[in-house]
Amino acid sequence: MKATGIVVEYNPFHNGHKLHLNKARELTQADVVIAVMSGSFVQRGEPAIIPKWERAKMALAAGVDMVIELPVSFATQHATIFAEEAVRILDAIHVDTLFFGSEHGVAEDFTFAAKKVVENEARFDEAIQLALVDKKTSYARAYTEAFKKLFGQNLLDITKPNNILGFHYALAAQNQNPSISLQTIPREHAGYHDEEANHDQIASATAIRKLILAGKLEEASHYLPASSIAILRNYEGPFLSWKDYWSFLQYRLIQAGSEELEGIRGVSEGIQNRMQQAATKAQNFSDFIELTKTKRYSNTRLQRTALQILLNARSQTSSPYIRILGMNKTGQQYLSLHKKNISLPIVTTVSKAPVGLLEEELRATNIYTLAKGLENYQAGDFHIPPILTL
């Protein structure tokens, strides 16, 4: 069976995702499409708008054959780690092709750039450090400066969010298994961060979440496949954002000592002190970010750091594993064919997982389900089984 892997968040699953999924199957001639998906919290450092099990249902209903959870310790980090660990999972489950959307749309350029970075690793790292020192800028900007210095302006614009992820997928594949084929298609109509829906059928997940959180589900439904609309209408819980967790974060920052926070993943350069001061003044999460941000810390980096503090995520990361959230008959057939040759631990029943393997994930789910209205999902890692569809 020919397998194609995709890395997703489906926050929520919309028409752009449906187009991407259909193209992944068609262009790679895949027998099975396997999605590695963020769980309760996503890469921008935010809570997912609905629980991971509902988003897995959306994926399966739209045609994904298997949904694997990207562990929270990787799903909520910067592009390098996010991509490395997603590719590690897809490689372990033996995908032939990694398929992704990008603003650039030419897979060969991603592969070429990744090979060049691997070949010039010392020079590239030196260029990053020079940019950090000379320009007193964020790591992301320093990385972009080093990339431009190495390749010039024209090869690949890694200031674009999907290009940077695509580049890190290519880099991870080069480092882990260069035989994984890469394919990409250009994103259509909506930019990743577009906050307004400006096309008849395609809008960014950001714009769709904005509509849903404003109580405009019917308006948002123009940009969702029928299967996603049905799941959202049947969903009985709240639609979530940082406002549902702000009081928990505020308490954590006020209650904790500065030294205690130093050991949290992503906390550096004394940023915890600014955050603790802001927590006593801010009225909401948006105020908090505005009061905390600096030239070196983008809003997204601050959100990620705030999330790690909320989750009490220590600097060490967890070991990778394959946690299956759901699969259809094709996915089950593929798993049975390859199960004996998969190098990572496979988790279908959490209670049978090796002790400590899912510790951070379980804590993240417990914190996520503190939001009012999620009582049915509390301890869901234990009582909600993988979703199996025909």
Swiss-Prot record:
Top-level taxon in the UniProt lineage: Bacteria
Protein family membership: Belongs to the TmcAL family.
EC code(s) of this entry: 6.3.4.-
Catalytic activities: cytidine(34) in elongator tRNA(Met) + acetate + ATP = N(4)-acetylcytidine(34) in elongator tRNA(Met) + AMP + diphosphate
Keyword Aminoacyl-tRNA synthetase found: no
Compartments, as annotated in UniProt: Cytoplasm
Chief location bin: cytoplasm
Keyword entries, A-Z: ATP-binding, Cytoplasm, Ligase, Nucleotide-binding, RNA-binding, tRNA processing, tRNA-binding
Pfam families: HIGH_NTase1
GO cellular component: cytoplasm
Disulfide bonds: none
Designated name of the protein: tRNA(Met) cytidine acetate ligase
GO biological process: tRNA modification
Residues involved in ATP binding: 7-20, 101, 162, 187
Reported function: Catalyzes the formation of N(4)-acetylcytidine (ac(4)C) at the wobble position of elongator tRNA(Met), using acetate and ATP as substrates. First activates an acetate ion to form acetyladenylate (Ac-AMP) and then transfers the acetyl group to tRNA to form ac(4)C34.
Any one GO molecular-function label of the UniProt entry: ligase activity, forming carbon-nitrogen bonds
